Amino acid sequence: MSLLPHLILYLTLLTVVVTGETLRPRFYSETCPEAESIVRREMKKAMIKEARSVASVMRFQFHDCFVNGCDASLLLDDTPNMLGEKLSLSNIDSLRSFEVVDDIKEALEKACPATVSCADIVIMAARDAVALTGGPDWEVKLGRKDSLTASQQDSDDIMPSPRANATFLIDLFERFNLSVKDMVALSGSHSIGQGRCFSIMFRLYNQSGSGKPDPALEPSYRKKLDKLCPLGGDENVTGDLDATPQVFDNQYFKDLVSGRGFLNSDQTLYTNLVTREYVKMFSEDQDEFFRAFAEGMVKLGDLQSGRPGEIRFNCRVVNRRPIDVLLVS
């Protein structure tokens, strides 16, 4: 069988690596006009199959974009020569529903082969996760390329832990030109979804090495968490991140005001005087939260590494280079 068609296709993709594009709305209006509709359709299917999955997919944008920009490096599986980001400290046993992105990519490849990047899928799917659960809808800028590699170490070095305090989070977000308001609004992504007992055991039983629970926890809520996450129990048990875990709303901020934040990194936003004003604002004004969240997601989506990229056929692996085709044929 002739290798020429394969070589032509892969050489075409190699030109993509070096050309790059400016992000813009409706990027696929000519090359794949139904791209955004296809992504939303697949997200609806995922939501029907498992409601929690859309919250899981929404988190991909944060965990991807903070590590060397929005390039779908998060989606790459480990290889013998590369430790990717899926097993980094902030992602292992935490991020899930990668199969939803697989399904979206498969649908897009059928409609528009080798056209829509996995990095753009992450951005569109995150937006749709919010909109489909009652939150804001916004126009996304597209035209990203997929990374050629990933780094577990880079993820470990950048991503915050559930123990992070507000001061650390402020400094982290400032590194990416995201304001305090952006940071607090984007933390509202925890309006939907669940977290593991593993992430809060120290809050319940040994906050700051005291051997005591976090004093910021409202007593009745602490008792609820004690029952959910007993000392010595299964740390993979999950609990709701706010009182309305399947609805994107401002209940998350109301819970923080009342001392019912699930994660330390959430509750610290209310105990810190710099971030408290935004928590109170969003708890009282859902429309303002929605506006700030959408603006923050757009800013987050603008983070780019400037590294070479491609349009992956499979979001879990980089494309074979022409030399790879020759070696295995």
Curated annotation (Swiss-Prot):
Disulfide bonds join C32-C112, C65-C70, C118-C315, C197-C229. One of its GO terms (molecular function) is lactoperoxidase activity. Its cofactor is heme b; Ca(2+). The active site is at H63 (proton acceptor). PROSITE patterns: PEROXIDASE_1, PEROXIDASE_4. Ca(2+) 2 binds at S191, D242, T244, D249. Heme b binds at H190. This is Peroxidase 17. The lineage of its organism: Eukaryota, Viridiplantae, Streptophyta, Embryophyta, Tracheophyta.
